Each structure stands twice: as C-alpha cells, then as structure tokens.
Curated annotation (Swiss-Prot):
Keywords: Cytoplasm, Nucleus, Phosphoprotein. Residues 1-31 are annotated as: Disordered. It comes from Schizosaccharomyces pombe (strain 972 / ATCC 24843) (Fission yeast). The lineage of its organism: Eukaryota, Fungi, Dikarya, Ascomycota, Taphrinomycotina. Its main location: cytoplasm. This is Rho GDP-dissociation inhibitor.
Length: 205
C-alpha cells in the first residue's frame, strides 16, 4: 500500500489503471500440466525430483472430493512489529463482511506486512500472485501485484508473508480507503477475490 504521502485522493492518476505493477520476479512452470503428468516427468532426474519436492508434488497429492477449489485462502493477517497480529478467518463469511465494512486501522507512517495462510488442492498452481487495487473516494490511488509463487497440492497449508510496506503520512493521506484484493495465477484464473477497508489515522486507536 504505497499510497503517495501528501497526495490528494481527488487527484486521479491514469497510470495507476495499468496492470503492470509487480513486486517480485515472475515465476513460471512452462506449459500447464496435470499433477499426474508432473509426477511422471523424468523420474530418474535427481534435480527434477528435488524441484518437484520443493513444490510439494508427491505421489499422494491432495484432492478432496467435496471441495473443487484449487486455491483456498484460509487466513489473512495484518502484521506489525510490537503489536499482536490482526487475523481474519477468510473461510468465515461474517469475518469477511466485517473487514469489508469496518476493516483495519493503520497508524500513519507505520511499517506493516500482510500474511496469508492458504492451501492448494488438486493440481499444481503456477505463478500465484496477490493483486490489489486501492481506492479512496472512488479514485484509484494505488495498484500492486505481489508474487507469491508456485505450489503443489498439499493438505498442510502454506504461509506467505509480504515484504514490509509503509502507511502514508500527512493530513491529506489520513482517512478511509477501500481495497479490492484477488489471488490470480499465471493462467489468469482468479482463485479468490474480496474487498476490505482500512483507515489511515494518527494513532492505532
């Protein structure tokens, strides 16, 4: 959330509509394959076996018959050094509605990170990224795309923590913001999309 300091929310920047904002290197597994195809790839190649193991590609995988989702976002966290994490259960509709309506309060100038706990099911996910568009008073003020990585199906959830970000400062930066977040893979499949709100304030309240 690198909203420019001392920038008016009424100043519309058309460059922020561009979909090229990106944090982190691109990750690609090449042509998309099924889990079985990945399992059969060069079984005698030790380096490839290590690569597949790093993605969690095993003989068992994880494919629950009662849940066809491939990426399941379990928890979202606001992480600030010296403060208790603010956790949101993304599987609970009431909690998701709460962050849409009320959201978080972030002290101006503070450094924070976003944590995500998620599970991958059924197939390998290539180039998963978190794309976020922030608006204030209806105008886009920030847009970012953060690479999370490529993962194989596993019953054990994965954890990802973003690089540190800094809340804007100054009287003009304070106020209410709305963010649209979505988790997208290399094939442009949107696996999860949600809306959350936050207020930049002089104190944590």
């Amino acid at each position: 959330m690198s909203v420019n300091n001392e920038v008016s929310a009424d100043q519309h920047n058309p460059e922020l509509e561009d979909d090229t904002f990106e944090h982190g290197p691109p990750v690609s597994l090449g042509e998309k394959k099924s889990l079985n195809e990945y399992m059969k790839m060069d079984a005698e190649d030790e380096s490839l076996q290590k690569w597949k193991a790093s993605l969690g590609i095993t003989g068992t995988g994880y494919s629950p018959s009662n849940d066809r989702r491939t990426v399941v976002i379990l928890k979202l966290s606001l992480l600030v050094d010296g403060r208790d994490p603010v956790d949101v259960n993304m599987e609970d509709a009431a909690s998701v509605e709460q962050i849409r309506k009320k959201g978080f309060t972030i002290k101006e100038g503070s450094e924070f990170k976003i944590g995500v706990k998620f599970r991958v099911q059924h197939e390998v996910i290539s180039g998963l990224r978190y794309v976020q568009t922030v608006r204030r008073r209806g105008f886009v003020v920030d847009k970012t795309s953060t690479m999370i990585g490529s993962y194989g199906p596993s019953e054990t959830p994965y954890d990802f923590t973003s690089e540190p970000d800094e809340a804007p400062t100054g009287m003009l930066a304070r106020g209410h913001y709305e963010a649209n977040g979505k988790f997208v893979d290399d094939d442009k499949v949107v696996h999860h999309e949600f809306v959350w709100a936050f207020d930049v304030a002089k104190s944590w309240k």
